[in-house]
């Protein structure tokens, strides 16, 4: 578990302090950190220091900890100074860096963490090495940095999380009852607000009134939730058939979150985008306001005023002139934006300085304002211009007098194909849930390839079958495939496979999901003759046993905490596996603690749950 020091909904809705997230879950934490303004001189371990804040390690406030020292050696046994040491935690099927340190003159770096396992990855000048570190068991660890990219091999890791160390405070019946009353009041406020959102029925009525596509309008307005008035205002302004098609396309290009907070000013600004010849490129890479993770702004109108007509026409005719202008005029200072949120394109124009990511967003935004199709590649993170021949990488760091396309325009690519032998209950591994791909950088570190994860409510996303079964194109280079099987104990059986992609060649590897001999582990006793009362709309309200309802064999039983975040997250996760669970065909019994709780459950909030559920 990795966390920053922020309270959660689970914590705030408990009857007493330290009952929710900050107790049992936090006791299994590996690293927690927070930021303190200015230079901090306290007892906590310092993670990093910036001109405005100090980041400190506060894991000791929440979980038992241990300190470990890592010594990085080269292939001859000599200590390596100034090597990058990354402490990695298995999370979402990748080894995610939770702390990054530099070795001292003796090749040493240290970290204090919860008593579980991490992967330590050391790199410098293209060489790297790695080893598993068990905090609490390994007080010293030597990492031999003797590997270079290019060699194909695989290594297995079993990573064990810290044990739970819960110290639950007592809760009196009076405290529980008082908290239940508060939750009823809070839920009434929330439900009163949610009741004002547009439903499928009201959205379709609006669509018919304004002669818009009913299905598209319904999806958009229901998804916009509390921002539906802005979306309705925008749609009502779409008069011609062309503008109606364009407006709906624009709304379907932005993310679900954008629909919930985009402003009318932004939508109107981007509806007036300049045209380019390729209609598909215009929809995806010109009119689309979303570049990366920035706050959406009406930047097209801004640049129309800020950039002269002559310059805009020159950039459109020769986009590399825009690359040269940005490389020469926008100074990159990664310390100027310590908060991390991207600087707006307008802000970059005015300041002429930005962090590298904000600079990249600025370039794409400026290009789109001039009808030059451009994007930041969602998988690799590279800035690209889009032409009839495909996507071309541009190097905004190159010498401004000699701007060129990287790899002479289009990067050389090969193909990756992975075979997979299904294990029980998993016939199609999912990206982020079961496997990830990362590219090795020239320095020796790893950069995740960020494929589509799908939508928690709608499913979809990247899987083995739609990415690797028939093969996918990758830039030439060295890569790592990480797979992981999570056990009931929380431990992970991982396999890390190193491989190389050559230009115009196909690389074939095997995607392996490791299994435990004790895959189904007994974690408690369960009486399948236990009785429950189905809700009236389930067909029968007569009490029956779980065995009667589900039959023998596998089934799932869950107890719902109504309107609580852990339950809501779990239900959305279940909804994303609707097709798989219905194909499995076994029953799922979701229980409520009592009739009062059952009455508060809004089933319409989770429309995509499997049909195999019994409430």
Q: How should each PLM-predicted stretch be described?
A:
Residues 589, 600-615:
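Short, internal strand/loop/helix patches
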Residues 67, 75-94, 115-116, 423-454, ...:
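Short, ordered, surface-exposed loop/turn motifs in non-cytosolic proteins
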Residues 126-148, 486-514:
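Structured interaction patches on ligand/partner-binding surfaces of diverse proteins
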Residues 546-570, 574:
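Short active-site neighborhood of thiol/selenol oxidoreductases, capturing the structured segment around
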Residues 2-7, 11:
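Single conserved hydrophobic/aromatic residue that forms the stacking wall/gate
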Residues 1, 91-112, 133, 443-468:
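Short, acidic Ser/Thr/Gly-rich low-complexity loop/linker segments typical of extracellular
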Residues 14, 82, 186, 190-351:
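Secondary-structure boundary elements
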Residues 108-119, 124-126, 133-136, 456-489:
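Short Pro-Gly-centered beta-turn/loop motif in secreted/extracellular proteins
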């Amino acid at each position: 578990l990795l966390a920053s020091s922020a309270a959660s909904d689970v914590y705030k809705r408990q009857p007493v302090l330290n009952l929710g997230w900050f107790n049992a879950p936090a006791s299994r934490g590996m690293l927690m950190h927070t930021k303190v303004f200015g230079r901090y001189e306290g007892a906590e371990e310092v993670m990093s220091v910036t001109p405005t804040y100090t980041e400190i390690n506060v894991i000791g406030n929440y979980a038992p900890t241990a300190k470990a020292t890592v010594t990085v050696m080269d292939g001859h046994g000599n200590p390596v100074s100034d090597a990058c040491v990354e402490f990695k935690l298995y999370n979402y099927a990748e080894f995610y860096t939770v702390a990054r340190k530099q070795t001292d003159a003796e090749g040493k770096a240290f970290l204090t963490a919860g008593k579980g396992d991490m992967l330590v990855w050391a790199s410098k000048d293209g060489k790297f090495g790695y080893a598993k570190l068990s905090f609490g068991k390994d007080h010293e660890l030597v990492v031999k940095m003797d590997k270079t990219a290019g060699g194909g091999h695989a290594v297995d890791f079993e990573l064990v999380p810290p044990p739970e160390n819960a110290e639950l405070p007592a809760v009196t019946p009076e405290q529980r009852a008082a908290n239940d009353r508060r939750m009823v009041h809070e839920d009434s406020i929330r439900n009163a607000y949610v009741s004002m959102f547009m439903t499928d029925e009201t959205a379709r009525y609006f669509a018919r009134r304004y002669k818009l596509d009913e299905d598209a309008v319904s999806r958009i307005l229901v998804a916009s939730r509390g921002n539906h008035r802005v979306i309705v205002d925008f749609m009502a302004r779409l008069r011609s058939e062309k503008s109606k098609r364009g407006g709906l396309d624009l709304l379907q290009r932005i993310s679900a979150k954008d629909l919930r907070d985009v402003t009318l000013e932004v939508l109107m600004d981007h509806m007036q985008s300049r045209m380019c010849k390729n209609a598909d490129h215009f929809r995806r890479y010109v009119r689309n306001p979303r570049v990366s993770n920035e706050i959406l702004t009406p930047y097209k109108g801004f640049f129309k005023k800020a950039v002269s007509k002559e310059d805009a026409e020159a950039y459109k005719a020769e986009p590399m002139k825009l690359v040269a202008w940005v490389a020469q005029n926008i100074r990159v200072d990664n310390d100027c934006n310590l908060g991390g949120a991207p600087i707006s394109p307008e802000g970059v124009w005015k300041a002429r300085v930005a962090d590298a990511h904000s600079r990249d967003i600025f370039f794409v935004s400026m290009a789109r304002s001039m009808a030059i199709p451009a994007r930041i590649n969602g998988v690799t993170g590279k800035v690209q211009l889009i032409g009839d021949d495909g996507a071309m990488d541009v190097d905004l760091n190159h010498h401004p007098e000699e701007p060129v396309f990287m790899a002479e325009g289009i990067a050389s690519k090969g193909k990756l194909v992975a075979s997979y032998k299904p294990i029980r209950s998993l016939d199609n591994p999912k990206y982020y849930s079961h496997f990830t791909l990362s590219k090795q950088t020239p320095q020796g570190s790893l950069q995740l390839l960020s494929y589509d994860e799908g939508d928690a409510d709608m499913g979809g996303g990247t899987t083995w079958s739609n990415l690797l079964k028939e093969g996918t194109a990758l830039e030439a280079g060295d890569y790592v495939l990480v797979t992981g099987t999570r056990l009931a104990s929380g431990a992970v059986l991982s396999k890390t496979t190193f491989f190389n992609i050559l230009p115009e060649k196909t690389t074939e590897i095997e995607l392996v999901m490791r299994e435990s001999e004790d895959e189904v582990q007994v974690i408690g006793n369960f009486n399948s003759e236990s009785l429950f009362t189905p809700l009236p709309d389930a067909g029968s309200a007569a009490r029956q046993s779980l065995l009667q309802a589900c039959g023998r064999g596998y089934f799932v039983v869950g107890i719902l905490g109504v309107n609580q975040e852990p339950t809501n997250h779990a239900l959305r996760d279940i909804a994303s596996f609707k097709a798989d669970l219905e194909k499995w065909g076994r029953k799922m019994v979701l229980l409520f603690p009592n009739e009062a709780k059952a009455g508060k459950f809004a089933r319409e909030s989770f429309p995509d749950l499997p049909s195999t559920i019994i409430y």
